[in-house]
């Protein structure tokens, strides 16, 4: 199977929500590895669920930005494919530069450079949600990140942090329960 056919399968196979059309076109244009396409679909799929949950709590987010950010957060790995199967952070600034070169607005491109830096004081809720989706898609729980999200949501609602954290924990547990299926989906595709 050709790399292009594998990417098309990663973008189209049933099981996860489709990426936004502009992101799918971008990945095709970049001849992205199929594994990257599958990974971005998995993270985007979880991000949709998280955004729906946050909005359901009564908190507004920039839905377009969060979902675009989740769908492109690792796009820099087209230049650093070794980071698809190993550690590395070179893809983060590279992804932001790549998106900027392609004319993507800074408010959307920023997630590529910031998704691993959630512990910054100035991290926005939108940025935190992209990072959260990038953890939970594979069943990983990050207590400090979850506490920070709960604090921001609780502050917006005027509720106690513990009450929001309990509801968030329930939602993330539900999402983490689907991690095995998402991992299997991603791992069906070549790097």
Predicted regions and their residues:
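Acidic/His-rich, divalent-metal-binding segments that scaffold phosphate/diphosphate chemistry
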Residues: 1-90, 141
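Generic structural signal of hydrophobic/aromatic residues within well-ordered alpha-helices
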Residues: 7-10, 23-27, 132, 145-153, ...
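Acidic-enriched, low-complexity/disordered segments with a strong bias for Aspartate over Glutamate
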Residues: 8, 13, 22, 45, ...
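Divalent metal-dependent catalytic cores for phosphoryl transfer on phosphate-bearing substrates
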Residues: 28-30, 59-159
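Generic secondary-structure signature for well-ordered alpha-helical cores
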Residues: 32-35, 52, 154, 158, ...
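A generic structural signal for well-ordered alpha-helical segments enriched in polar/charged residues
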Residues: 49-52, 97, 174
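Charged phosphate-binding loop/patch that engages nucleotide di/tri-phosphates or the phosphate backbone
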Residues: 161-191
